[in-house]
UniProtKB/Swiss-Prot annotation:
Homohexamer. HAMAP family: Hfq. GO terms for molecular function: RNA binding. Belongs to the Hfq family. Keywords: RNA-binding, Stress response. Pfam families: Hfq (PF17209). This is RNA-binding protein Hfq. The gene is hfq. PROSITE patterns: SM. The keyword Lipid metabolism does not apply. GO terms for cellular component: cytosol. InterPro entries: Hfq (IPR005001), LSM_dom_sf (IPR010920), Sm (IPR047575).
Length: 88
């Protein structure tokens, strides 16, 4: 997994698994609404009355309808430990 996707994938997956409604704003200002059905490295499949495949490069902002918790132990790959802070 690319380092830049270490936050994106768990966030989108939490939205998908919990079926949280989202507003997706595109770079041209258009607002799309629905639930995330699926996603991959390049696209998000958004479900409302119809399914829409939205390319990630066209997305400005993803706004969940409610708070989502996406940093749980189950989101980390096996063997990866949470970052520890050290005081010097």
């Amino acid at each position: 997994m690319a380092k830049g996707q270490s936050l994106q994938d768990p966030f989108l997956n939490a939205l998908r698994c919990e079926r949280i409604p989202v507003s997706i704003y595109l770079v041209n200002g258009i607002k799309l609404q629905g639930q995330i059905e699926s996603f991959d490295q390049f696209v998000i499949l958004l479900k409302n009355t119809v399914n829409q495949m939205v390319y990630k490069h066209a997305i400005s902002t993803v706004v969940p309808a409610r708070a989502v918790s996406h940093h749980t132990a189950s989101d980390r790959p096996q063997g990866e430990r949470p970052q520890e802070t050290t005081e010097e």
